[in-house]
Design a protein with these regions (language model features):
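Iron-sulfur cluster-binding electron-transfer modules in prokaryotic oxidoreductases
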Residues: 1-288
Protein backbone atom coordinates (compact mmCIF):
# COMPACT_ATOMS: atom_id res chain seq x y z
CA UNK A 1 0.00 0.00 0.00
CA UNK A 2 2.86 2.39 0.76
CA UNK A 3 4.24 1.90 -2.74
CA UNK A 4 0.85 2.51 -4.34
CA UNK A 5 0.26 5.76 -2.46
CA UNK A 6 3.83 6.92 -3.15
CA UNK A 7 3.30 6.43 -6.87
CA UNK A 8 -0.07 8.17 -6.75
CA UNK A 9 1.40 11.11 -4.83
CA UNK A 10 4.15 11.43 -7.43
CA UNK A 11 1.66 11.35 -10.29
CA UNK A 12 -1.24 13.35 -8.84
CA UNK A 13 0.30 15.44 -6.09
CA UNK A 14 0.99 15.35 -2.36
CA UNK A 15 -1.86 17.77 -1.67
CA UNK A 16 -4.47 15.33 -2.96
CA UNK A 17 -3.25 11.82 -2.14
CA UNK A 18 -2.45 10.88 1.47
CA UNK A 19 0.72 9.02 2.33
CA UNK A 20 0.28 5.53 3.72
CA UNK A 21 2.25 5.58 6.93
CA UNK A 22 1.63 2.90 9.55
CA UNK A 23 0.15 2.51 11.96
CA UNK A 24 -3.07 3.28 10.09
CA UNK A 25 -6.32 2.68 11.96
CA UNK A 26 -8.66 0.03 10.59
CA UNK A 27 -11.98 0.95 9.01
CA UNK A 28 -14.94 1.46 11.29
CA UNK A 29 -17.62 -1.16 11.58
CA UNK A 30 -20.52 -0.83 9.18
CA UNK A 31 -23.51 0.72 10.89
CA UNK A 32 -24.00 2.17 14.34
CA UNK A 33 -24.68 0.36 17.63
CA UNK A 34 -28.40 -0.07 18.29
CA UNK A 35 -30.06 2.66 20.34
CA UNK A 36 -33.65 3.73 20.93
CA UNK A 37 -35.24 7.15 20.87
CA UNK A 38 -37.81 6.74 23.69
CA UNK A 39 -36.24 7.63 27.02
CA UNK A 40 -33.03 8.98 25.52
CA UNK A 41 -31.20 11.58 27.59
CA UNK A 42 -29.35 13.00 24.59
CA UNK A 43 -28.96 12.77 20.84
CA UNK A 44 -25.57 11.33 19.88
CA UNK A 45 -23.96 12.54 16.65
CA UNK A 46 -20.87 10.39 16.01
CA UNK A 47 -18.28 12.49 14.18
CA UNK A 48 -17.51 11.57 10.58
CA UNK A 49 -13.96 10.58 11.50
CA UNK A 50 -15.28 8.10 14.06
CA UNK A 51 -17.60 6.66 11.42
CA UNK A 52 -14.62 6.24 9.08
CA UNK A 53 -11.89 4.92 11.38
CA UNK A 54 -12.32 2.05 13.81
CA UNK A 55 -10.50 1.30 17.01
CA UNK A 56 -6.78 0.58 16.81
CA UNK A 57 -5.90 -3.09 17.01
CA UNK A 58 -3.78 -2.37 20.10
CA UNK A 59 -6.92 -1.33 21.94
CA UNK A 60 -8.62 -4.58 20.99
CA UNK A 61 -5.63 -6.79 21.77
CA UNK A 62 -5.42 -6.11 25.49
CA UNK A 63 -7.05 -9.38 26.50
CA UNK A 64 -10.41 -7.75 27.20
CA UNK A 65 -13.22 -9.85 25.69
CA UNK A 66 -15.73 -7.08 26.43
CA UNK A 67 -13.73 -4.34 24.72
CA UNK A 68 -15.97 -2.21 22.49
CA UNK A 69 -14.82 -2.21 18.90
CA UNK A 70 -15.73 1.38 18.16
CA UNK A 71 -16.07 4.71 19.92
CA UNK A 72 -19.85 4.82 19.36
CA UNK A 73 -20.14 1.40 21.01
CA UNK A 74 -18.16 2.60 24.02
CA UNK A 75 -20.06 5.87 24.43
CA UNK A 76 -23.43 4.19 24.05
CA UNK A 77 -22.48 1.55 26.65
CA UNK A 78 -21.11 3.91 29.29
CA UNK A 79 -23.98 6.37 28.87
CA UNK A 80 -26.51 3.59 29.40
CA UNK A 81 -24.57 2.41 32.44
CA UNK A 82 -24.82 5.88 33.96
CA UNK A 83 -28.58 5.94 33.39
CA UNK A 84 -28.25 8.54 30.59
CA UNK A 85 -28.93 6.57 27.40
CA UNK A 86 -28.10 8.27 24.12
CA UNK A 87 -29.89 7.91 20.82
CA UNK A 88 -28.12 7.72 17.45
CA UNK A 89 -30.65 8.66 14.76
CA UNK A 90 -31.05 6.03 12.06
CA UNK A 91 -30.55 8.68 9.35
CA UNK A 92 -27.32 10.06 10.81
CA UNK A 93 -25.26 9.08 7.74
CA UNK A 94 -24.27 12.14 5.73
CA UNK A 95 -24.45 14.58 8.63
CA UNK A 96 -21.29 16.60 9.26
CA UNK A 97 -20.27 19.74 11.13
CA UNK A 98 -18.75 21.20 7.95
CA UNK A 99 -15.23 21.58 9.32
CA UNK A 100 -13.55 19.61 6.49
CA UNK A 101 -15.06 21.98 3.94
CA UNK A 102 -13.98 25.05 5.91
CA UNK A 103 -10.45 23.69 6.23
CA UNK A 104 -10.22 23.25 2.45
CA UNK A 105 -11.68 26.68 1.71
CA UNK A 106 -14.93 25.29 0.27
CA UNK A 107 -17.11 27.84 2.00
CA UNK A 108 -20.26 27.24 -0.03
CA UNK A 109 -20.02 23.52 0.61
CA UNK A 110 -19.43 24.16 4.31
CA UNK A 111 -22.48 26.41 4.52
CA UNK A 112 -24.69 23.87 2.77
CA UNK A 113 -23.44 21.03 4.96
CA UNK A 114 -23.75 22.74 8.33
CA UNK A 115 -27.20 24.16 7.53
CA UNK A 116 -28.38 20.68 6.62
CA UNK A 117 -26.91 19.24 9.82
CA UNK A 118 -28.42 21.91 12.06
CA UNK A 119 -31.83 21.20 10.54
CA UNK A 120 -31.34 17.50 11.27
CA UNK A 121 -30.18 18.19 14.82
CA UNK A 122 -33.20 20.40 15.44
CA UNK A 123 -35.49 17.61 14.31
CA UNK A 124 -33.63 14.89 16.20
CA UNK A 125 -33.40 16.91 19.42
CA UNK A 126 -37.14 17.61 19.40
CA UNK A 127 -36.68 21.31 18.86
CA UNK A 128 -33.76 21.58 21.26
CA UNK A 129 -35.38 19.61 24.10
CA UNK A 130 -32.55 17.05 24.14
CA UNK A 131 -28.87 17.98 24.25
CA UNK A 132 -26.65 16.87 21.39
CA UNK A 133 -23.42 14.97 22.17
CA UNK A 134 -20.51 14.94 19.70
CA UNK A 135 -17.52 12.63 20.15
CA UNK A 136 -14.69 14.66 18.54
CA UNK A 137 -13.64 18.01 19.96
CA UNK A 138 -12.81 19.57 16.59
CA UNK A 139 -16.31 18.74 15.34
CA UNK A 140 -17.93 20.14 18.47
CA UNK A 141 -15.89 23.31 18.09
CA UNK A 142 -16.66 23.54 14.38
CA UNK A 143 -20.39 23.30 14.93
CA UNK A 144 -20.42 25.80 17.78
CA UNK A 145 -18.47 28.28 15.64
CA UNK A 146 -20.68 27.82 12.57
CA UNK A 147 -23.16 30.66 13.16
CA UNK A 148 -21.73 32.86 10.40
CA UNK A 149 -22.42 30.12 7.84
CA UNK A 150 -26.03 29.57 8.88
CA UNK A 151 -29.16 31.15 7.53
CA UNK A 152 -31.23 33.11 10.05
CA UNK A 153 -33.64 30.30 11.05
CA UNK A 154 -30.81 27.82 11.53
CA UNK A 155 -28.72 30.32 13.49
CA UNK A 156 -31.65 30.62 15.89
CA UNK A 157 -31.97 26.84 16.07
CA UNK A 158 -28.29 26.36 16.85
CA UNK A 159 -28.43 29.02 19.56
CA UNK A 160 -31.43 27.27 21.13
CA UNK A 161 -29.79 23.84 21.23
CA UNK A 162 -27.35 22.49 23.81
CA UNK A 163 -24.29 21.10 22.01
CA UNK A 164 -21.99 19.08 24.27
CA UNK A 165 -18.60 17.62 23.55
CA UNK A 166 -18.15 14.07 24.81
CA UNK A 167 -15.69 15.39 27.43
CA UNK A 168 -18.35 17.64 28.97
CA UNK A 169 -21.01 14.94 28.63
CA UNK A 170 -18.85 12.41 30.44
CA UNK A 171 -17.48 14.73 33.13
CA UNK A 172 -20.70 16.50 34.04
CA UNK A 173 -23.45 14.00 33.20
CA UNK A 174 -21.97 10.48 33.35
CA UNK A 175 -19.16 10.43 35.91
CA UNK A 176 -21.35 11.39 38.92
CA UNK A 177 -23.48 8.28 38.29
CA UNK A 178 -20.68 5.82 37.55
CA UNK A 179 -18.68 3.68 39.95
CA UNK A 180 -15.00 3.38 39.12
CA UNK A 181 -13.57 -0.01 40.00
CA UNK A 182 -9.82 -0.58 40.08
CA UNK A 183 -7.97 2.54 38.94
CA UNK A 184 -4.90 2.44 36.74
CA UNK A 185 -1.56 3.82 37.85
CA UNK A 186 -1.16 6.71 35.42
CA UNK A 187 -2.90 8.32 32.46
CA UNK A 188 -1.11 10.55 29.97
CA UNK A 189 -3.29 13.21 28.33
CA UNK A 190 -2.93 14.97 25.03
CA UNK A 191 -5.10 18.13 25.21
CA UNK A 192 -6.39 19.03 21.74
CA UNK A 193 -6.42 22.49 20.20
CA UNK A 194 -10.20 22.48 19.89
CA UNK A 195 -10.58 21.23 23.45
CA UNK A 196 -8.42 24.15 24.56
CA UNK A 197 -10.62 26.59 22.63
CA UNK A 198 -13.71 25.05 24.24
CA UNK A 199 -12.22 25.18 27.74
CA UNK A 200 -12.45 21.40 28.16
CA UNK A 201 -8.92 20.56 29.29
CA UNK A 202 -9.75 20.86 32.97
CA UNK A 203 -12.72 18.53 32.57
CA UNK A 204 -10.59 15.99 30.72
CA UNK A 205 -8.05 16.11 33.54
CA UNK A 206 -10.87 15.65 36.06
CA UNK A 207 -12.05 12.56 34.21
CA UNK A 208 -8.53 11.19 34.10
CA UNK A 209 -8.07 11.85 37.82
CA UNK A 210 -11.14 9.72 38.52
CA UNK A 211 -9.62 6.84 36.58
CA UNK A 212 -5.91 7.01 37.40
CA UNK A 213 -3.77 7.62 40.46
CA UNK A 214 -1.53 9.97 38.47
CA UNK A 215 -2.44 12.28 35.60
CA UNK A 216 0.34 13.46 33.29
CA UNK A 217 0.00 16.35 30.84
CA UNK A 218 3.37 16.77 29.10
CA UNK A 219 4.65 20.34 29.15
CA UNK A 220 5.19 20.17 25.40
CA UNK A 221 1.72 18.82 24.66
CA UNK A 222 0.59 21.60 22.35
CA UNK A 223 -0.72 21.26 18.78
CA UNK A 224 -0.01 17.82 17.33
CA UNK A 225 0.24 19.28 13.83
CA UNK A 226 -2.14 16.73 12.31
CA UNK A 227 -4.67 19.47 11.49
CA UNK A 228 -7.44 17.40 9.96
CA UNK A 229 -5.92 15.64 6.96
CA UNK A 230 -2.57 17.47 6.93
CA UNK A 231 -0.96 14.69 8.92
CA UNK A 232 -1.98 12.22 6.22
CA UNK A 233 -0.76 14.43 3.38
CA UNK A 234 2.39 15.70 5.13
CA UNK A 235 3.25 13.37 8.03
CA UNK A 236 6.48 15.28 8.57
CA UNK A 237 4.44 18.19 9.97
CA UNK A 238 2.98 16.09 12.75
CA UNK A 239 6.31 14.35 13.39
CA UNK A 240 8.01 17.71 13.91
CA UNK A 241 5.20 19.14 16.04
CA UNK A 242 5.13 16.15 18.40
CA UNK A 243 8.87 15.47 18.79
CA UNK A 244 9.22 17.19 22.16
CA UNK A 245 5.99 15.75 23.50
CA UNK A 246 7.00 12.26 22.38
CA UNK A 247 10.16 12.32 24.48
CA UNK A 248 8.19 13.40 27.55
CA UNK A 249 5.57 10.71 26.92
CA UNK A 250 8.32 8.08 26.81
CA UNK A 251 9.67 9.29 30.14
CA UNK A 252 6.20 9.25 31.72
CA UNK A 253 5.72 5.51 31.07
CA UNK A 254 1.94 5.84 31.40
CA UNK A 255 -0.54 3.00 31.68
CA UNK A 256 -3.01 4.70 29.31
CA UNK A 257 -2.75 7.49 26.76
CA UNK A 258 -5.95 9.44 26.23
CA UNK A 259 -7.27 12.18 24.01
CA UNK A 260 -10.61 13.38 22.59
CA UNK A 261 -10.05 13.72 18.84
CA UNK A 262 -9.39 10.85 16.44
CA UNK A 263 -6.86 12.41 14.08
CA UNK A 264 -4.86 13.78 17.01
CA UNK A 265 -4.80 10.25 18.41
CA UNK A 266 -3.45 8.93 15.11
CA UNK A 267 -0.68 11.54 15.11
CA UNK A 268 0.30 10.89 18.73
CA UNK A 269 0.26 7.12 18.23
CA UNK A 270 2.66 7.50 15.32
CA UNK A 271 4.88 9.91 17.22
CA UNK A 272 5.13 8.01 20.50
CA UNK A 273 4.54 4.36 19.67
CA UNK A 274 1.86 4.35 22.38
CA UNK A 275 -1.79 3.64 21.62
CA UNK A 276 -3.65 6.93 22.04
CA UNK A 277 -7.41 6.49 22.29
CA UNK A 278 -10.47 8.44 23.27
CA UNK A 279 -10.81 8.71 27.03
CA UNK A 280 -14.25 7.11 26.58
CA UNK A 281 -12.69 3.66 26.14
CA UNK A 282 -10.91 3.91 29.50
CA UNK A 283 -14.02 5.29 31.20
CA UNK A 284 -16.10 2.43 29.85
CA UNK A 285 -13.59 -0.24 30.87
CA UNK A 286 -13.04 0.96 34.44
CA UNK A 287 -16.73 1.47 35.27
CA UNK A 288 -18.07 -1.97 34.32
Amino acid sequence: MAGITAAARAAIGAELVPEWEPPMPPPAKAGMPPTVQPGAAAVYLPACVNRIFGRDTEGLAAGDPLAPGSLPEALVAVSLRAGKPVWIPTDVAGSCCGTPWVSKGYRDGAAWMVNSTVEDLWRWSDGGRLPVVIDASSCTHGLLEAAERLNAPNAERLAAMTILDSVAWAADHLLPDLEVGERIGSAVIHPTCSGTHLGLNGELERLAAALADEVVVPDEATCCGFAGDRGFLHPELSASATAGEASQVAAANGDAHICANRTCEIGLTRATGESYESFVYLLERLTR
